[in-house]
UniProtKB/Swiss-Prot annotation:
The chain crosses the membrane at residues 121-141. Residues 1-21 form the signal peptide. Keywords: Glycoprotein, Membrane, Signal, Transmembrane, Transmembrane helix. It is a single-pass type I membrane protein. Residues 190-222 are annotated as: Disordered. Pfam families: Ig_C19orf38 (PF17737). This is Protein HIDE1.
Length: 222
């Protein structure tokens, strides 16, 4: 039994939801139109279809009297509008005349998502930018590491220089202390030697000694 007869008989508001699908040619860019087919059950002919995108009405179409489906050509943001097609989530709904010529609306169809492939140049540009950012990051990290190493090396050299200066100062102090000890010891030894010598008799020269007696030999006078 056709749905129209059932609707007139029962006045029910629960009529089947339509099916929705993309049909070729499929869009490859934002400038390409989007073709969406919306189909009611096979025995419902000449229904009025409404296409929604994100809860907003995009287009209204009536199916031919001998067909249960329509094909929407989305080329803009509104019904029949021109311009750039936009992707998103689409769904559709249809309506028929019920009892007492009251319009009866179906449930909403499933959603179909329309997206566009990323252009090659955008992908190449994104990869180039990502590579440039990565390279810049690596260069910055390398510079920071080298600066840190140079700073640590400079600190190590300063510490080594400080220790060398301290050791040199200690060596000089030890040498000065040794010289001072030797000088003090020599001074003490000289003082002791002076005290031990005391008054001594000066040696007399040979000229001051008493002259030895003169001896003479006399021969007898004959």
């Amino acid at each position: 039994m056709p749905w129209t007869i059932l609707l007139f008989a029962s006045g029910s508001l629960a009529i089947p939801a339509p099916s929705i699908s993309l049909v070729p040619p499929y869009p490859s860019s934002h400038e390409d139109p989007i073709y969406i087919s919306c189909t009611a059950p096979g025995d419902i002919l000449g229904a009025n279809f409404t296409l929604f995108r994100g809860g907003e009405v995009v287009q209204l179409l009536q199916a031919p009297s001998d067909r249960p489906d329509v094909t929407f050509n989305v080329t803009g943001g509104g019904s029949g509008g021109g311009g750039e097609a936009a992707g998103g989530n689409f769904c559709c709904q249809y309506g028929v005349m019920g009892e007492h010529s009251q319009p009866q609306l179906s449930d909403f169809s499933q959603q179909v998502q329309v997206s566009f492939p990323v252009p090659t140049w955008i992908l190449a540009l994104s990869l180039s930018l990502a590579g440039a950012v990565l390279f810049s990051g690596l260069v910055a990290i390398t510079v920071l590491v080298r600066k840190a190493k140079a700073k640590n090396l400079q600190k190590q050299r300063e510490r080594e220089s400080c220790w060398a200066q301290i050791n040199f100062t200690n060596t000089d102090m030890s040498f000065d202390n040794s010289l001072f000890a030797i000088s003090t010891k020599m001074t003490q030894e000289d003082s002791v030697a002076t005290l031990d010598s005391g008054p001594r008799k000066r040696p007399t020269s040979a000229s001051s000694s008493p002259e030895p007696p003169e001896f003479s030999t006399f021969r007898a006078c004959q």
